[in-house]
Structure formats: structure tokens, C-alpha cells
């Protein structure tokens, strides 16, 4: 009876190659499932990965089978209704109560959707795939770095898909040569001695028999050295290295005025949390400036930005003025890629909206790489949206989007930050 001993150091990941192939094959269905799932959970809840469901029809394997048409001769077993040489009429509609002219059955049967779990890393990779900071100019190589996968030699651990056959066979040859070199040397000496004895007179039969036995034992020892061992296996190693890129800063401007009810604020926070996860996942170092505003604007830290309860009236231009001041003080446009994401319900003091238009057109949009405005409201658009629509027509680096319900957040986010052509 034969025994197989699994000596692989990475045995627990033996199905990883099949999992990766499955994720690649059904990526579109998985991404759609993730897009649906993100509306049902907090975007900060990523530690547990995500349960993904795929309709069973989408993963059915194609199969060849005979159609209902054509002429075929078959021999069927007989029974009490048919005897030899009887002919059986062709069933109508395939005879199965399925598609065609047959009748449907009264009992419906089916299969549940295929459900499986993806890890946190797989979840985030799929969530932010094909997204990037728009118009990123790669000219000042300092803090910001994108991660890219590079070959990094070989490793003794890995998944079967990354195995290096040539390097593994080289190691196998080196090991077998080292382990059998002394035995092969001794074997050559014994074979030479046996040749001398066979040609000598008188014959020394006992000595010849001893040499033949010793030669047989040495050959058996050499043959027992395995052709390949887990010690020989080498896998192509890959590592994520930070690629130098330009410095970048993201300004997050959030309206916290009294017109923003709690549901609207929650949607704005969910958008900004999604933005934060995207930046921290995709780029190594990005400065983030948080600005909250009502009648007055204030630069705050991350904790206060998301959790402060302060509120008041609405003057949107206060946030734009503060952003302009911070840019002039700390972020030279010649050295920084400047981005901004503004979220508001669109309710603003009427005389202030033209001022917002002027500030953006003359001071902010000429120096930023990309400015996005998200209006979160179920009401009709007001003067601020109309002023911003005019800016969108005049500036390519300005984009506006409308969010009505929580399920709009992720599609709007992908629309704003989908990958574009990068300037060099």
C-alpha cells in the first residue's frame, strides 16, 4: 500500500491558485456583488471581509449535448407496451417539460446563489480597482508613493502558480550531485577494481562476488536519493514596492450647517470615509486637510471632522477662503498636487453662491489638479448647484455629482475617481 506525505511548507494555501483563478474569472459578478453589499454595511467595517453571492446561472459550466432536432436511430429497452421493431414517436418539445412546446411542471425547483467569503485585502482591492487620483502630475518625487508589484528573486515558499521549474530543477541537480558525489566516486573505483579482477589470472571468484555486491548496494543508495524534494522547490517572489510619485494633498470640505440633517451628514461622512480608505489603500503618503464649515470654517483633525456636533448657519465661501489660505501657506501648487472634495446639501445664503463661483474660478481651480463637489439632497437644486454647473462647463478639472440615497454613494465615488490618463 502506498503512502503520500504532504511535506509542503505552504500546504494550508494549496488551493490558493484555484481561488485566484476563480476571482479573476468571475471578477465582474464579484464586483457587482461588492457594490451591492457596500450599501448594506458600514464602509469602515472591513476587518471581516465580505460574503459575496453569485447567481448560480453565472457559474454554470458550458456543456455539449444533443439537440432536439435531426434524425437519429436509437435502440431502447422493451417493456410491456413495446415489442421488437416498434417505433417510438419523437417527444414534443424535447419531452422534458422545459423550453419548447412541452408543458411546464407544476413544481418549481432551483438552486440558491453561490455564496463565499473574501478576505479584507481582496475586498479592498476589488472595491478600489481602476480608481486613481485624477490628473496626478509626476514631477516632484518626494512623499507620495504608489505601490506596484515587482519581481524580487525567489523564495522557498509560495503557491503552485508561482513555481519556477528551471530554478527548482537546478536545485534538484545540485542536491543530487552533492549527496551522491562520494558514492559515485566509490562506485567508479569498485567498477574499475572489478574490471581488473575479471581480466586477471587466476580468477578470484569470491572477491569478484564481494565487489559486485558492493556495487549493487551503492547503486541502490544512489537510486534512493529522490529526484526532487521540497527542499529544491523555488517560487518566483513578488513584493509591493513604493513607486516614487508626486506629493499630493486632499482637502475635505464638509458642510455641517443646521440645514444638514443627521441622515445627510451620515451620507457625507460615509463618502469621506470611503475616500480616506481609498487614499490610504492606494497611496503611501497623502496629506489630508479636514475643513468643517457653517457660517465659519475651521480646520480640524480627523476625529473632530467625523464626530464633532458643532453646527450653525451656512456660508460656503468661508470654507473656500480657508482652503485658499492653507494652500498659500503650506502647499505650493508648483510642488504639490492639490485635490479637493466638497460635500454639502446645496443650501447656502443666496448672496454667497456667486462669491463661491468667483473664489473657485479665480483662486482655487487654477491651482488644483481636481475638485469634486457632491450635493446630498432629495430637494430641488438651489443657487449653489447652478453656479457650480457653470464652473463645470468651463473647467475640465471640476466635477459635480448628486447623491440622493445611501446606495448612490459608491457609484458616485467610482465616477469621480475612475482612472484617467496620467500626465508625465
Swiss-Prot record:
Record Pfam families: DUF444
Sequence ranges of Gly residues compositional bias: 92-105
Superkingdom of the organism of origin: Bacteria
Region spans: Disordered: 84-109
UniProt family annotation: Belongs to the UPF0229 family.
PANTHER family: UPF0229 PROTEIN YEAH (PTHR30510:SF2)
Name of the featured protein: UPF0229 protein YPO2152/y2169/YP_1953
Organism: Yersinia pestis
Amino acid at each position: 500500500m502506498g503512502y503520500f506525505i504532504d511535506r509542503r511548507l505552504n500546504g494550508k494555501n494549496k488551493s490558493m491558485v484555484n481561488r485566484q483563478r476563480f476571482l479573476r474569472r468571475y471578477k465582474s459578478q464579484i464586483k457587482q456583488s461588492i457594490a451591492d453589499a457596500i450599501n448594506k454595511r458600514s464602509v469602515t467595517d472591513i476587518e471581516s471581509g465580505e460574503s459575496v453571492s453569485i447567481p448560480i446561472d453565472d457559474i454554470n459550466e458550458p456543456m455539449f449535448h444533443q439537440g432536439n432536432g435531426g434524425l437519429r436511430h436509437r435502440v431502447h429497452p422493451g417493456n410491456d407496451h413495446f415489442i421488437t421493431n416498434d417505433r417510438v414517436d419523437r417527444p414534443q418539445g424535447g419531452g422534458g417539460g422545459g423550453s419548447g412546446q412541452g408543458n411546464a411542471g407544476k413544481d418549481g425547483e432551483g438552486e440558491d446563489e453561490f455564496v463565499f467569503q473574501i478576505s479584507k485585502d481582496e475586498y479592498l482591492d476589488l472595491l478600489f480597482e481602476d480608481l486613481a487620483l485624477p490628473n496626478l502630475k509626476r514631477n516632484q518625487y518626494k512623499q507620495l508613493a504608489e505601490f506596484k508589484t515587482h519581481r524580487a528573486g525567489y523564495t522557498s515558499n509560495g503557491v503552485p502558480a508561482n513555481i519556477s521549474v528551471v530554478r527548482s530543477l537546478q536545485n534538484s541537480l545540485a542536491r543530487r550531485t552533492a549527496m551522491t558525489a562520494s558514492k559515485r566516486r566509490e562506485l567508479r573505483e569498485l567498477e574499475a577494481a572489478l574490471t581488473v579482477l575479471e581480466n586477471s589470472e587466476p580468477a578470484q571468484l569470491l572477491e569478484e562476488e564481494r565487489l559486485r555486491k558492493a556495487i549493487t548496494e551503492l547503486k541502490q543508495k544512489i537510486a534512493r536519493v529522490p529526484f526532487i524534494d521540497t527542499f529544491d522547490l523555488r517560487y518566483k517572489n513578488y513584493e509591493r514596492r513604493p513607486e516614487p510619485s508626486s506629493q499630493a494633498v486632499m482637502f475635505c470640505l464638509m458642510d455641517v450647517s443646521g440645514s444638514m440633517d443627521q441622515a445627510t451628514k451620515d451620507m457625507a461622512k460615509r463618502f469621506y470615509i470611503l475616500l480616506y480608505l481609498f487614499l490610504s489603500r492606494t497611496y503611501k503618503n497623502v496629506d489630508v486637510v479636514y475643513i468643517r464649515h457653517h457660517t465659519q470654517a475651521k480646520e480640524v483633525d480627523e476625529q473632530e471632522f467625523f464626530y464633532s456636533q458643532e453646527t450653525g448657519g451656512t456660508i460656503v465661501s468661508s470654507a473656500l477662503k480657508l482652503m485658499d489660505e492653507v494652500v498659500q501657506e503650506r502647499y505650493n501648487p508648483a510642488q504639490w498636487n492639490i485635490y479637493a472634495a466638497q460635500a454639502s446639501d446645496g443650501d447656502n445664503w443666496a448672496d454667497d453662491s456667486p462669491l463661491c463661483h468667483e473664489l473657485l474660478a479665480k483662486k482655487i481651480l487654477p491651482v488644483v489638479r481636481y475638485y469634486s463637489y457632491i450635493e446630498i439632497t432629495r430637494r430641488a437644486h438651489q443657487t449653489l448647484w447652478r453656479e457650480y454647473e457653470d464652473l463645470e462647463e468651463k473647467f475640465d478639472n471640476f466635477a459635480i455629482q448628486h447623491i440622493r440615497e445611501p446606495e448612490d454613494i459608491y457609484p458616485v465615488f467610482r465616477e469621480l475617481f475612475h482612472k484617467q490618463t496620467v500626465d508625465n
